[in-house]
Curated annotation (Swiss-Prot):
NCBIfam families: yjeF_cterm. It catalyses: (6S)-NADHX + ATP = ADP + phosphate + NADH + H(+); (6S)-NADPHX + ATP = ADP + phosphate + NADPH + H(+). It is found in: Cytoplasm. This is ATP-dependent (S)-NAD(P)H-hydrate dehydratase. (6S)-NADPHX binds at G120, N173, V174, V175, E176, F177, A178, R179, D246. It comes from Ajellomyces capsulatus (strain G186AR / H82 / ATCC MYA-2454 / RMSCC 2432) (Darling's disease fungus). Its cofactor is Mg(2+). The keyword Cytoplasm applies.
Length: 368
C-alpha cells in the first residue's frame, strides 16, 4: 500500500468511534436508505454490519423482499409511487401534492443522522417528485446525503437541489459521470484518460455543483470536493456485478454517521478543537489529510503519538469518501479471490468485517 494511503487510513481511524460500554442504541449511527421500487430492491450491505440502527424506506411492493435480507433491518414501506397514487395520471408535473405525499418520510427525518438515496430507487415519476421534496428537507436540516444510481438522475435534471451543499457525496460511475458533466456543461471531454485527467475532470464537475464531494468510480476511484483531489488506489476485484455500488453507499452512510459522532464529541479523542472562524483553504485541508497534526510517524502509523488538533469537517468528508471507496474495493478483491467469475454483489457482504479490520482496524479504547 502506498504511503499516502497509509496516512489517509491513519486519519480515518481517528473518526471511528471506540466501542464503549456507556454508548447506547443508535448513538453510533441512525442511517436510512431511500430505495426499493416495484422493479428492484437495493442490495443492502455494509451499513447493516457496522452502524447502530438501520432503516430502509421503500415502495410497498418491495418491502417483503427487503425484509427478507435480515431481521436487523427496520423496513418502512411509506415511499409512494404511481402504483399507489391513483390520481397521478391526471396531475401535471411537478405533482401538486408531492409535499403531502412525502410527509410520512419527512416526519421521519428528525430521527436520522444520515440519508442514502438511490439504491433500487427506480424512475417512477411520483417517486422522483417525492424524493425531490425529501432532498430539499434533508438539506434544510443539514443531514448528510449520499446520492447514487437513480438519485443522480434528479441531480442531472435539477442540479440546484444540491448545488453548494457540501454535506453531500455523489457516487457516479463512468456513464453517470459523463451525463452529469454534460447536463452541467462542465468541460471534461478534453481531459486525458489518465489519473491526472480524471482528477481534473472530477474537480471541474464538483465545482460546477458548488463543492459537492464526488467519487468517480473507475479502475482507480477519483475523489474531489472542488479544491482537493485524492485517488483511492486500493486494489479491487476484476468482476463487476450489479449491486456492488450499494456496498459503497452503505459504507459511506456508516462512515458519515461516525463522522457526525466525531465532530459532536461523542467520545474523548484527546484532540484540541481546530481553530474556527475562517474559511479553510486548499492547503489547510491538504495538511489535515497528510496528518500534519501528528508530532511524528510520517509513515501514517500511530506510534503512540497523539494528534494535536481535531480534523476539519471538509477533511473528514474527504476521508469518509476515500475510506468508503477503499473498503468497497478491498471487499471486491477478497470476494473475487474467493469466487472468481461467479462472484456476485452479495459475496462482498461476507468480506466487510475482515476488510474493515485489515484496512482501518479498531481504534484505541475499544475492548473486544
Amino acid at each position: 500500500m502506498s504511503s499516502p494511503s497509509k496516512k489517509l487510513l491513519a486519519n480515518v481511524r481517528r473518526i471511528v468511534p471506540p466501542m464503549l460500554e456507556r454508548f447506547h442504541k443508535g448513538q453510533l449511527g441512525r442511517v436510512a436508505v431511500i430505495g426499493g421500487s416495484a422493479e428492484c430492491a437495493p442490495h443492502i450491505s455494509l451499513q447493516w454490519h457496522l452502524q447502530g440502527l438501520s432503516h430502509v424506506i421503500c415502495e410497498p411492493s418491495s418491502a417483503t423482499v427487503i425484509k427478507s435480507y435480515s431481521p436487523n433491518l427496520m423496513v418502512h414501506p411509506i415511499l409512494q409511487s404511481s402504483n399507489t397514487v391513483s390520481s397521478f395520471s391526471n396531475s401535471p408535473l411537478p405533482h401538486p401534492h408531492a409535499r403531502a405525499l412525502a410527509e410520512p418520510v419527512l416526519s421521519f427525518l428528525s430521527r436520522l443522522h444520515v440519508l442514502v438515496i438511490g439504491p433500487g430507487l427506480g424512475r417512477d415519476p411520483v417517486t422522483q417528485e417525492i424524493v425531490t421534496e425529501i432532498i430539499k428537507e434533508a438539506r434544510s436540516r443539514e443531514i448528510p446525503l449520499v446520492l447514487d444510481a437513480d438519485a443522480l438522475l434528479l441531480v442531472q435534471e435539477h442540479p440546484d437541489l444540491i448545488h453548494g451543499y457540501t454535506e453531500c457525496i455523489l457516487t457516479p460511475n463512468v456513464v453517470e459521470f459523463a451525463r452529469l458533466a454534460k447536463a452541467l456543461r462542465a468541460d471534461v471531454s478534453s481531459m486525458p484518460d489518465s489519473d491526472a485527467g480524471k482528477s481534473e475532470a472530477c474537480k471541474r464537475l464538483s465545482n460546477a455543483l458548488g463543492g459537492v464531494t464526488i467519487i468517480q468510480k473507475g479502475p482507480h476511484d477519483t475523489i474531489s470536493n472542488g479544491m482537493v483531489n485524492i485517488v483511492c488506489d486500493v486494489r479491487g476485484g476484476l468482476k463487476r456485478s450489479g449491486g456492488q455500488g450499494d456496498t459503497l453507499t452503505g459504507s459511506l452512510g456508516t462512515l458519515l454517521a461516525w463522522r457526525k459522532a466525531y465532530h459532536e464529541g461523542l467520545w474523548d479523542t484527546g484532540e484540541s478543537e481546530a481553530s474556527g472562524g475562517r474559511e479553510l483553504s486548499r492547503q489547510d485541508i491538504e495538511e489535515d489529510l497528510s496528518i500534519c497534526g501528528y508530532e511524528s510517524g510520517d509513515d501514517g502509523e500511530r506510534d503512540g503519538d497523539k494528534p494535536k488538533k481535531k480534523l476539519s469537517r471538509p477533511a473528514t468528508l474527504l476521508l469518509v469518501a476515500w475510506a468508503g471507496s477503499a473498503i468497497t474495493r478491498e471487499c471486491s478483491r477478497r470476494a473475487f479471490m474467493a469466487k472468481g467469475r461467479s462472484m456476485q454483489a452479495s459475496d462482498l457482504t461476507d468480506e466487510v468485517h475482515g476488510s474493515f479490520l485489515d484496512l482501518i482496524g479498531e481504534p484505541e479504547g475499544t475492548k473486544l
